């Protein structure tokens, strides 16, 4: 596993990159060692949530400039792994939303580090319930898309009985699929979210490709800075340099 020291204007953060996400690991190593991030800002900071950086357009950006859309001319294939989750200190890849990015491909350069909150078990159970409902809905919509032509033919022929039967069939299929592989939190996730904290609602949505091993106090300091509209810090928080360590 590679380690990278992120030297910022508020202190140093060391992250370890996971070997389980080789596409993101190799890309981050390439950009960091090539000086790509030097001089960029943590342009989006939300207290009790996360700090985001990696936009090359943030280098020397004047106050008030809207940031967050810059990056290289490529995206990265998602490497979303169930055992890599959004605990406090997780290093993750930013991306565009599902409506324009259904495959959840990552930004070529933008990343965020999780701060989040500590949850109690009842909060996680409620969240888990919502996750299961969402899982059924997403699976049902996927099945509808798969049977789109058949459904369109029924609509053209005004076959209401057939449409009703198809809906019931696909809903049952979706429920059966989800029962076989239910959404929820592992013991490791529950332990992390009820002790150190994090952002559990992002699990399964974004690629987590590393974690902070030193300098979590610096992350805390950055996530607590005052911000302007658009979540940009009032006073720039700059990445001075990134150094690849053994």
Listing of model-derived features with the role each one plays in the protein:
Residues 1-246:
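Cyclophilin-like peptidyl-prolyl cis-trans isomerases
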């Amino acid at each position: 596993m590679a380690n990278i020291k992120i030297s910022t204007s508020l202190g140093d953060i060391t992250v370890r990159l996971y070997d389980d996400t080789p596409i993101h690991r190799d890309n981050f190593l390439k950009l960091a060692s090539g000086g790509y991030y030097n001089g960029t800002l943590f342009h989006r900071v939300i207290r009790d949530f996360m700090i985001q950086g990696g936009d090359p357009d943030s280098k020397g950006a004047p106050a008030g400039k809207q940031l967050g859309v810059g990056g290289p001319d490529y995206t990265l294939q998602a490497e979303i792994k169930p055992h890599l989750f959004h605990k406090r200190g997780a290093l993750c890849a930013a991306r565009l939303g599902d409506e324009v990015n259904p495959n959840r491909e990552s930004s070529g350069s933008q990343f965020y580090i999780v701060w989040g909150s500590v949850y109690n078990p009842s909060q996680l159970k409620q969240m888990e319930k919502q996750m299961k409902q969402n899982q059924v809905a997403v699976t049902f919509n996927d099945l509808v898309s798969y049977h789109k032509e058949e459904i369109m033919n029924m609509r053209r022929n005004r076959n209401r009985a057939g449409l009703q039967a198809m809906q019931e069939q696909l809903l049952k299929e979706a429920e059966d699929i989800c029962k076989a592989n239910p959404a929820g939190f592992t013991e490791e996730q529950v332990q992390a979210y009820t002790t150190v904290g994090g952002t559990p609602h992002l699990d399964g949505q974004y690629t987590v490709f590393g974690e902070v091993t030193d300098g979590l106090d610096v992350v805390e300091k950055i996530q607590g800075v005052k911000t302007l509209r658009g979540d940009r810090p009032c006073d720039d928080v700059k990445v001075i340099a990134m150094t690849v360590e053994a």
